[in-house]
């Protein structure tokens, strides 16, 4: 989890540093990324098929090692299956399970990284569409072989990450972004 967070921080910093001051579109993207966070207060409400397709397309556009696109996404709307994967999921919420191959010429860390890039694209796209999002690793322990089979996951794949998408309630002090460590305590420069 810590490695994932460090990797995402590096990617975010790289995106921010590549923005020219005069580019309003880029400045808007940086502002959007800086304001995004993992939601905690979801509510009931349908997420349209069109939104899910946009979100999946954004994930599919992510970069990957050797352009291998080490991902398979399983969209779960079935309430019973969602309940077996995680608790307290509101009616209408959708889970996207990111899976990667068990066997590859690339190390499993690369496959997980590729999945994380795709999930981050989907995370941000869902938020741009006005939806709440949250990534999970802990519920992966619930995804045993039987459940993966019922999710129609490819046989040679394992679950890497879960993205929850849904309608959200108003942001409050509990549901807002968690405090960040000061950036200067997480970055060093070598001139």
Where are these regions (language model features)?
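Positively charged n-region of N-terminal signal peptides that target proteins for export
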Residues: 1-4
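Acidic, surface-exposed loops and disordered segments
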Residues: 8-13, 18-191
